[in-house]
């Protein structure tokens, strides 16, 4: 009996040893393989020399086509290499809101290469940095639509790439429908020729006011001709295109009224502004003409009032350039008060031309206040100072023995 028990025990030991020779090693690999990945560099090196089977199981090859984003450094290097942008130009492109938003999730270099192959110039990338943020697939569709217009240069129509594909398709259809109506083939080139402005500048403004390209051609043509006939500056026409939404008759009437009032610069806003504003503007122009009289400019008028030559009067105004923007009616009122009522000399006015820009009401109030304290300022400087500086001067004057010589007027 004892012998049979010993034999059974030996058999069990042999069976257990046979089963545990390899499974223990495999289970250890399965349970603790995540810790083996943290092995030291020396162990990794040695394992590489022993065999590459284990390393190949964990290696994932790099695929460039899986990378969709563009690092800032890569984008900057690509821009420098292709266009030789200056640092200021690169900063303008990178700081653009759309570019900054998209460069991490989209390959902007691919879009840039596509646009470059289509002929988009260096200047267009600087003027419209958002071009880099366009979706490449939609960009191909947009380029096909623009090419159907037979343009002379893609850069003439770059601003329209910002439109959605359906909106651009509608716009291109409207422009192509007028091909035979004008020798210029479309309105962009028509406006460019009429105003003598580069097509790319025309597109820059028209892309923000698309109604110009879709409104009835007859109405558009007449309004444009009215602007030209009344010598409205081309750039002012492009900057304020809302005037084209009014009927040609009303546009002509408003421009004629401005011309009769002898406005030195007729602006498109005069067509669309409310009637009271137009009347006030025309009245101011007539008042200025009345003040100028025989003189053709504010410089000549100031020279006459102060008794200086025209060149001397211009030098006086140049000391404080803001004087050039002051209406001659205000200059007259200020000079009448300073020279006739306050009894300042022409030289005192010439030394401080800033007084011509200062509020006449404030000037009078300060003069009356100083006069009540027995102070007659030796110059006009203190009258133009800030409220805090003026109050400091006044308190300093009052605290002394009312001696003007003992008070510094700055």
Swiss-Prot record:
InterPro entries: MTERF (IPR003690), MTERF_sf (IPR038538). It holds the Pfam family mTERF. The keyword Transcription regulation applies. One of its GO terms (biological process) is DNA replication. Disruption phenotype: RNAi-mediated knockdown is lethal. Most mutants fail to develop past the L3 larval stage, and the few pupal escapers do not develop to the late pupal stages. Mitochondrial DNA (mtDNA) copy number fails to increase during larval development and instead steadily decreases. Increase in broken mTDNA replication intermediates. One of its GO terms (molecular function) is DNA binding. The keyword Transcription applies. Disulfide bonds: none annotated. Transcription termination factor. Binds promoter DNA and regulates mitochondrial replication and transcription. Transcription termination activity may be polarized with highest termination activity occurring when its DNA-binding site is positioned in the reverse orientation with respect to the incoming RNA polymerase. Required for normal topology and maintenance of mitochondrial DNA (mtDNA) levels. Regulates mtDNA replication by promoting replication pausing, possibly by acting as a natural barrier to replication fork progression. This is Transcription termination factor, mitochondrial. It comes from Drosophila melanogaster (Fruit fly). The gene is mTTF.
